[in-house]
Amino acid sequence: MVNQSSPMGFLLLGFSEHPALERTLFVVVFTSYLLTLVGNTLIILLSVLYPRLHSPMYFFLSDLSFLDLCFTTSCVPQMLVNLWGPKKTISFLGCSVQLFIFLSLGTTECILLTVMAFDRYVAVCQPLHYATIIHPRLCWQLASVAWVMSLVQSIVQTPSTLHLPFCPHQQIDDFLCEVPSLIRLSCGDTSYNEIQLAVSSVIFVVVPLSLILASYGATAQAVLRINSATAWRKAFGTCSSHLTVVTLFYSSVIAVYLQPKNPYAQGRGKFFGLFYAVGTPSLNPLVYTLRNKEIKRALRRLLGKERDSRESWRAA
């Protein structure tokens, strides 16, 4: 069946019934996007320039920052255009590209956050063997697996979603082209797509989240066996930032991809979708830097607020 909507594209409704809210959201989204660009670029730059950040933890953090930059850039420019003006259309090709990239990068983040939880588990529970277990080659392998698996997932799910028989009104009740909103737009049988969405949600959302919780459960047990307040504070400082990011990201993803079928849940899902597409990438740099002394020190050096010689910089 030929997709009748492909010549004209789609109409992204967003919150078009509330023009005043759209103006406010434009300012919020634009500000968040700027914070995302500046914050994540700084983390990548510091991870490259500062030798003490040449470790697995910051390798994965810089990978997450690069991912967040791509993640937001794939959808925010189109979102800003739709929020600012009366034109809220997106071409079929544009929707296809956005869906493919957004789905791939979102899946990558789910897997990468799991890898980072494993890294923190080894750092806390196996500190003496950390360098042996989490070596540079393994870091590259784990990061590559995350990107390749997400690419395969997007290659499988994107075509089947775009080949649905869409309703003639072509109105997507969302800010961007996502699998759940496109399934709701279909006027045909969506049983296969709903099963596919459920299976992929279990594999790439439920399973990674379960592994993250299991790793932190094991980490908590190991920390409780240590009768040292200093060790507790160090373990908390090591894991709290990542656990905060996991909570923000996964709570939003679950609200979008595992929501019940009712109008209230779908309306609420738009807010959560907006948050995990725009909010979490802008908050991630803040969360990771607020309690991280190494990144703070590197940032002060980059800004010239610490007058260290070139030799002390290299020695660090």
From Swiss-Prot:
Pfam families for the chain: 7tm_4
Gene Ontology molecular function: any one: olfactory receptor activity
InterPro entries reported for this sequence: GPCR_Rhodpsn (IPR000276), GPCR_Rhodpsn_7TM (IPR017452), Olfact_rcpt (IPR000725)
Location of the protein in the cell: Cell membrane
Mode of membrane association: Multi-pass membrane protein
Residues in the Cytoplasmic compartment per record: 48-55, 119-137, 218-234, 291-316
Transmembrane intervals: 24-47, 56-77, 99-118, 138-156, 194-217, 235-257, 271-290
Principal location: membrane
Disulfide bridges in this chain: C95-C187
Membrane topology, Extracellular segments: 1-23, 78-98, 157-193, 258-270
Organism domain of life: Eukaryota
GO annotations of cellular component type: plasma membrane
GO biological process: one example: detection of chemical stimulus involved in sensory perception of smell
List of glycosylated residues: N3
Keywords, alphabetical: Cell membrane, Disulfide bond, G-protein coupled receptor, Glycoprotein, Membrane, Olfaction, Receptor, Sensory transduction, Transducer, Transmembrane, Transmembrane helix
PANTHER family: OLFACTORY RECEPTOR
Protein family according to the UniProt entry: Belongs to the G-protein coupled receptor 1 family.
Its job: Odorant receptor.
Official protein name in the record: Olfactory receptor 2H1
Organism: Homo sapiens (Human)
Lineage: Eukaryota, Metazoa, Chordata, Craniata, Vertebrata
